[in-house]
Regions:
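PLP-dependent class I/II
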Residues: 1-36, 40-378
Length: 378
């Protein structure tokens, strides 16, 4: 027997559920929606973006997707015509980007985050890589920035973001802003600023800079990976280009309705005046505090280990320590026909049962590892 909703749910959550159902044609989640997603849900997301940034947002700029990944693939399909089209990607990199670029036949143009400055993004290096690629006949079309960083866990300084936006404008690049960890900030001296906010703060309008911003329900404090909800917000594109984006999105008909609903809830959560707010805030704060404790515990533990250096845990869900292996271990790895960090990771697994990911899998050239811990509560 289904209990009366009022006996187990707050009045505002019941009201929100009714409002959402009213937005869906037929009041059911089993039918197709508009290819960009249900208009009322996009309105809710636009409202959340505007509240976050302090600048207006338009529901027509929002494409709801099955997580952020399909939005990345869509833009790669749009941007890449052949192997001479390049995309600037940070190294260490989230493998989604290299895989998507390869899938669509383009060229990955790496730029290297500076480990000695907390995995900082240095415009001088990005410019060097851009010029080198252009000298080889590669038409570099976009710059990917992941903030907070995956797999490096850094949070970009606001001043650095201004430099990035100006660089993209001057060089005629599309800015692809992966912001799916925007809620995961652990350093007291760091704050998330969306690139949309940075662009508008500079006074740039629709004619100045093409920007694609990604968000997902898989990360943050919600972590609903299997629900496959997310969106991309596109601004600064001409009408003919927007038409092509819509055509590509239409090929997949629409994203799943449950994920669309979750994306709207993530960007438009309970307000302080709502009955459910205290419960929502307690759970949110508890999850983020637990993630911060785990990040700090690992950071401190790594700093005490001989031969290991690790930057501070600022955001996302990752630490990226560097392991200095002795020459004998490097020679043993070579004899086993394995990369030194992969050799170390396998030996660690065999000896302790601890799973780490070799840094070389993220394009890192030094002997580094990523350790990800999300399950143990501290």
């Amino acid at each position: 027997m289904i209990p009366d909703a009022s006996s187990c749910c707050s009045a505002d959550s019941i009201s929100r559920a009714k409002q959402i159902l009213a937005l869906i044609p037929g009041r059911a989640t089993g039918a197709y929606s508009h290819s960009q997603g249900i208009k009322g849900l996009r309105d809710a997301i636009a409202s959340g973006i505007a509240s976050r940034d302090g600048f207006p947002a338009n529901a027509d700029d929002i494409f709801l997707t099955d997580g952020a990944s399909p939005g990345v693939h869509l833009m790669m399909q749009l941007l890449i015509r052949n192997e001479k089209d390049g995309i600037l990607v940070p190294i260490p990199q989230y493998p989604l980007y290299s895989a998507s670029i390869a899938l669509h036949g383009g060229s990955l143009v790496p730029y290297y985050l500076n480990e000695s400055t907390g995995w900082g993004l240095e415009i001088s290096d990005v410019k060097k890589q851009l010029e080198d690629a252009r000298s080889r006949g590669i038409d570099v079309r976009a710059l990917v920035v992941i903030n907070p960083g995956n797999p490096t866990g850094q949070v970009l300084a606001e001043e650095n973001q201004y430099d990035i936006v100006k660089f993209c404008k001057n060089e005629g690049l599309v800015l692809l802003a992966d912001e799916v960890y925007q809620e995961n900030i652990y350093a007291d001296n760091k704050k998330f600023h969306s690139f949309k906010k940075i662009v508008r703060s500079l006074g740039y309008g629709e004619e100045d800079l093409p920007l694609v911003s990604y968000q997902s329900v898989s990360k943050g404090y919600y972590g609903e990976c299997g629900k496959r909800g997310g969106y991309m917000e596109i601004t600064g594109f001409s009408a003919p280009v927007r038409e092509q984006i819509y055509k590509i999105a239409s090929v997949n008909l629409c994203s799943n309705i449950t994920g669309q609903i979750l994306a709207s809830l993530v960007m438009n959560p309970p307000k302080a005046s709502d009955e459910s707010y205290a419960s929502y805030k307690a759970e949110k704060d508890g999850i983020l505090a637990s993630l911060a404790r785990r990040a700090k515990a690992l950071e401190v533990a790594f700093s005490k280990l001989e031969g290991i250096t690790c930057n501070k845990a600022e955001g996302a869900m990752y630490l990226f320590p560097q392991i200095c292996l002795p020459q004998k271990a490097i020679e043993a790895a070579k004899a086993a026909n394995k990369a030194p960090d992969a050799f170390y990771a396998l030996r660690l697994l065999e000896s302790t049962g601890i799973v780490v990911v070799p840094g070389s899998g993220f394009g890192q050239v030094t002997i580094s590892l990523v350790e990800i811990s999300r399950k143990t509560n501290i």
